[in-house]
Amino acid sequence: MLVLGSLQFVGFSPSSTPPKQRLAKIFSPTTTDDVLRCPVDGSALVSERTVVGSQVVRRLRTSAREYPVNEVYVDLLSTSGRTSPLTVDDLVGELRDAWESRTQTQMFRTPWLAFVYERGWRQQFRAAGFPGIDAEFAEVNEFFAPAAGGVVVDMSCGSGLMTRRLARSKAYGRLLAVDYSESMLAETRRRCEQEKTPTDALTLCRADVAQLPLADASIDAMHAGAALHSWPRLETGLAEIRRVLKPGGRFFATTFVQGAYGVRAPGMMTGGGGSFRFFDSTDELKQLMVDAGFDADGVDVRIEGRGCAIVKCVVPAEADISEVDAEAEAEVVAEARLL
């Protein structure tokens, strides 16, 4: 099962338990996800299955909201969990958001872009200095080594270029491929099936980086390839990434800086949604990370070629109690010697 990963449907097996009790156990909402959360209030999500005719309907729910699970992805946009009728104000707000993000977000929802992304679109990034997906994966794989066996997110996964390589590595206990675009998630699934990518640990999830449906300090590492420039609420998204990373967690991102294609591109107009955001310098990117909550000493930004920025962030690890006690004892001893 591609979409559900650890929430996979449990089949029937021989048992002495009466059929009705077995059905109640299988379809009762008793499985709580330890990573995914409601994007609105952060509450835990319970996996629920119901049988409608010959179909099994799956969803994730809280006490107040329900999020659908289709054959491709778990839909964890905040608007997907709405159970009350859509008001005029809700509609106006959603239309405003769609207009303000028409280039950065809405363009990537079109099926044609999902189709061409690995058929020429992504290849043009080489001209800007992007190393190429295999070289990028090699660096990501090395950087994520401390996250082996943990939970890794491929944010803005697109067509699954990095997702498939992370999945094939079998290095992680759980892999979440997250994107806002339904079309990109469908393309990720199609390519995973076509390439027979291992999907036991993989969950595809539709979500907004500015409202991540993830628990605090639940993620060991996160990748966002060629993505920062296309996030309409970049600062909020980066703060969300910092929120969900564990102590010692790692964030790896690639994006564009000015001059990537030999000319200066217009910066993103505030609230305009009319263009991508090409960053001015490594200093600007580093400051964005620091403002999001990353420690300055744990942020590294470098430029490859004419305009590919590679960002690496490491969250400080929690101090080991024994080390703290040893340091405190040493200070006491030193002070005693001065007396």
Located regions from the model:
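A short acidic, Gly/Pro-enriched loop at the edge of an enzyme's catalytic core
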Residues: 210-222
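Short alpha-helix
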Residues: 277-293
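A short SAM/SAH-binding and catalytic strip from SAM-dependent methyltransferases
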Residues: 221-233
